[in-house]
Structure formats: structure tokens, C-alpha cells
Amino acid sequence: MWEQYASEIIGTIKWFRDLDYHVLVTALAKEETNDNGGTEYWPLLPMAKVQKQLPGIFDNVLAGVRRTEDAKDEQGRAVGVRVERFIVCDQYGGWHCKVRDPLRSLQAVERTGNIADLFRKMEGKQSNKITEKDTKA
């Protein structure tokens, strides 16, 4: 029964992947401890077997990561919160991501919160360096 369920879920995912236009699928991340005590992050899906197959099904599997820290002035006083956004594009820090980038223009972790920046870089329309200015909304 569970094998059939997994097969149907994978079939549905492949159906979405094979649509005749660009498809973006989003998922929450599932944190998992591996046999060595390290933390791994997988797309959150109903079955572990299906979770681990997802990166092999799609051309691009990315993870959006947000880091916040207290911002301080020169005297060390709190002046607000600083937010940084990153997109993980490869196996890094326990994240299971990948990008099919023929130009190999992307780093394992890109400092941006905008997926369109990554696609511009892969098309060769942008320099390899994404600056702070590029990430501001």
C-alpha cells in the first residue's frame, strides 16, 4: 500500500515537472539528524522515501535561508534588526540542493533573496557577483 502511495506521489510530482511551461514548486524544509549526528534539510513531503527523491526529479532545487541578528551602532547600542537572505544552490551545510547550471556561474550559496537573480546569472546576463544593492527591495 505505501509503495503504491509513494509511486503515485512521485508520478504527480513528475506530471507537474513535465508541464509545457516553467514550474516553481515550493515546500517547507524538514530537519533531520543523520547517522553521524549531523543535521540535514530535505523538502517536507509526506514520506521520507519521496523526500529524498525530489532533488533528482527537478533541474533546480533551491533553499531560501533567512538570517537575522541585532544591529548595533558604533557604541554597541541596539538599533534594530538586520536581515540577510541567501539561496542555497548546492549540497551545503546539510541542505540537499542542486542547480543544473551549464555555465557553472552560481556559488553553493548566493547572497540574495531573489530567485530571478540566479536565473539571470545562469543565462550569463549578470556578473558573477551579486552585490548588497542588488538584494535590496
Regions found by a protein language model. Give the residues of each.
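Conserved H-loop
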Residues: 28
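Flexible beta-alpha connector loops of hexameric P-loop NTPases
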Residues: 1-5, 39
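Phosphate-interacting basic helix/loop segments used at nucleotide- and nucleic-acid interfaces
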Residues: 5-12
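Loop/turn-to-beta-strand initiation segments
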Residues: 19-25
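Conserved GTP-binding G-domain of TRAFAC-class P-loop NTPases and closely related GTPase folds
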Residues: 15, 31-137
